[in-house]
Amino acid sequence: MDSQRNILLIALALVSFLLFQQWNVAQNPAPQAVEQAQSGSTLPAPSYADDLDPAPGQVASAKTITVTTDVLTLSIDTVGGDVVTANLNDYSAEFDSEDTFVLLKNEPGHQFIAQSGLVGPQGIDLSSTNRPSYTVSADSFTLAEGQDELRIPMTYQANGLDYTKTFVLKRGSYAIDVEYDVVNNSGNNATFGMYAHLRQNVMDDGGSLTMPTYRGGAYSTEDTRYKKYSFDDMQDRNLSLNLANGQGWAAMIQHYFASAWIPRDEAGSNLYTRVIGNLGDIGVRMPNKTIATGDEASFKATLWVGPKLQDQMAAVAPNLDLVVDYGWLWFIAKPLHTLLSFIQGIVVNWGLAIICLTFIVRGAMYPLTKAQYTSMAKMRMLQPKLTAMRERIGDDRQRMSQEMMELYKKEKVNPLGGCLPILLQMPIFISLYWALMESVELRHSPFFGWITDLSAQDPYYILPLLMGASMFLIQKMSPTTVTDPMQQKIMTFMPVMFTFFFLFFPSGLVLYWLVSNIVTLIQQTLIYRALEKKGLHSK
């Protein structure tokens, strides 16, 4: 198999990969019963599921307070204590925009909020029309210079019970602790359980062919480290799983960003989903606690609302960092991302880091590349003998196959030697694709010149055109034995097809492919010179 056919193989693999990933994002089937059994024991739906917020609609916001830290700006509704707006201070809404990115919002036609409350026999959050109206000491709270932690207590009293709902935010963190403290002076026992869920409009946001994205639910249990549960899944079947030993979380994820509730109860919780109208919920329900009169009890959960930063998320909850979904080649993509981040810390530019990573990857793969070209050169040297063999043997395929294998063995040629290195390189490309696609660090990161955002396509298509030209040069430098007119036309058209595809790829990925092609040209020149000295190649 010569280099021209290898390029065809790469093209077919790339197109297949693009079509597969688009299908994989769109087709996210609900877990079967056996999967549910593996990920946690099935429990009845929470008792409050039918009467909590029975009617879809926008949450009433008679009064909200503003909470500001170095990385977050939140709006919290004093009715119920829901987080109804979350601005990420370090992330712009669009490239070169002064507006910050809004992850949680409560707007007509687009609701995405984080709700929490107390339910159970004496619950105070059993209905959307009857939730507690908390008292707060101020309308705004700001994490001051030199202050590492900000606590916002909200108080409510009813029927001899004192409730304090406290939000705890820390400097540099997107994790928010939500704590309930209940003091029972009612003269009777009181039973409560805490719930916390994310509510979002059911929507379809599949991205493009070259950059498909997922927007929907995801969860983790003790037995299932990470699993998506799309809005379609929620509409098909309500999920109800047991989170044993206090492990697990429920999340809503999208490209680059995620929100998640992590229960902080060692006794275990119930993970649930449901759809009400056009609103989808995914959340956790912690077990009830009975508080004797004169006693007090506390409930706690952590809300993550921010970018997909793997190190921080891993520190908040086990497996939460897996929302950075590298696909089935995660074991390759994750080390590549780690290496890329390490290089970026040295060169302080993500574009330069991609270039350095390309040289490292292609350097590590040089033995495979050399073996590939050497094998192809030997195969070309055998072409006259193979042609004569076909003329001598005719249509006897079995004899032809036997004599070909004897010839390969005699000449010490592996007929797959030119193909296998290419197949081994494809997982690297696919893994790097996901590493770049899932890296929020590359979002709106500039390179040089006209490349002002490595996560967006080249605005002037210069990199894709250069990439196509480099492919054309590789073709011209590669000897070929292809004589079939149709194959020749396909190979001639291949750089054009690749260029078209890469017009819509993020410029960071096109940069990798362009530099990889340049390295290929350099390696190709060096290998051909060495093969010429051995008589295996001629100009």
Swiss-Prot record:
SS bonds (residue pairs): none
Location of this chain's protein in the cell: Cell inner membrane
TM region(s), chain numbering: 6-26, 341-361, 416-436, 454-474, 495-515
Region Disordered, annotated ranges: 35-55
GO molecular function: membrane insertase activity
Start-end of Polar residues biased regions: 35-44
InterPro entries from the UniProt entry: Membr_insert_YidC (IPR019998), Membr_insert_YidC_N (IPR028053), YidC/ALB3/OXA1/COX18 (IPR001708), YidC/Oxa/ALB_C (IPR028055), YidC_ALB_C (IPR047196), YidC_periplasmic_sf (IPR038221)
Entry-linked Pfam families: 60KD_IMP (PF02096), YidC_periplas (PF14849)
GO BP annotations listed: protein insertion into membrane; protein transport
Membrane topology note: Multi-pass membrane protein
Keyword annotations from UniProtKB, A to Z: Cell inner membrane, Cell membrane, Chaperone, Membrane, Protein transport, Transmembrane, Transmembrane helix, Transport
Gene Ontology, cellular component aspect: plasma membrane
Subunit record text: Interacts with the Sec translocase complex via SecD. Specifically interacts with transmembrane segments of nascent integral membrane proteins during membrane integration.
Functional note: Required for the insertion and/or proper folding and/or complex formation of integral membrane proteins into the membrane. Involved in integration of membrane proteins that insert both dependently and independently of the Sec translocase complex, as well as at least some lipoproteins. Aids folding of multispanning membrane proteins.
HAMAP family, per database record: YidC_type1 (MF_01810)
Family statement drawn from the similarity comment of this UniProt entry: Belongs to the OXA1/ALB3/YidC family. Type 1 subfamily.
PANTHER family per the UniProt record, alphabetical: CYTOCHROME C OXIDASE ASSEMBLY PROTEIN COX18, MITOCHONDRIAL, OXA1
Name of the protein described by the UniProt record: Membrane protein insertase YidC
Organism: Vibrio atlanticus (strain LGP32) (Vibrio splendidus (strain Mel32))
Gene coding for it: yidC
